[in-house]
Amino acid sequence: MAVKLKIKKGDSVKVITGDDKGKTGKVLAVYPKTLKVVVEGCKIAKKAIKPSEKNPNGGFINKEMPMDISNVAKVQE
């Protein structure tokens, strides 16, 4: 049975637990099957990029990673 999620893409949320506790941001993506959300500017991870035609040297990028939906609360706008 599917769970009805109260948080949608584009909502403003506040992180209530974890390393980014207290930060607010916009929801960039919602994953209902795994009950995870991606919040702008929170849970940043450094990802390695292989060399390609666009980026011949490769390198690293900072990317927002999904966090559990129970770790965020919707904020009134």
Curated annotation (Swiss-Prot):
Q: Which SMART domains match?
A: KOW
State any single GO MF term.
rRNA binding
**Disulfide bridge partners, by residue number:** none
The organism's place on the tree of life at top rank: Bacteria
- Which of UniProt's keywords are assigned here? Ribonucleoprotein, Ribosomal protein, RNA-binding, rRNA-binding
Under the cellular component aspect of Gene Ontology, which terms does the record hold?
ribonucleoprotein complex; ribosome
Q: Which GO terms are recorded in the biological process aspect for this UniProt protein?
A: translation
Q: Does the keyword Ribosomal protein apply?
A: yes
* Quaternary data: Part of the 50S ribosomal subunit.
What this protein is reported to do is described as: One of two assembly initiator proteins, it binds directly to the 5'-end of the 23S rRNA, where it nucleates assembly of the 50S subunit. One of the proteins that surrounds the polypeptide exit tunnel on the outside of the subunit.
Q: Which family does it belong to?
A: Belongs to the universal ribosomal protein uL24 family.
Which named protein is this?
Answer: Large ribosomal subunit protein uL24
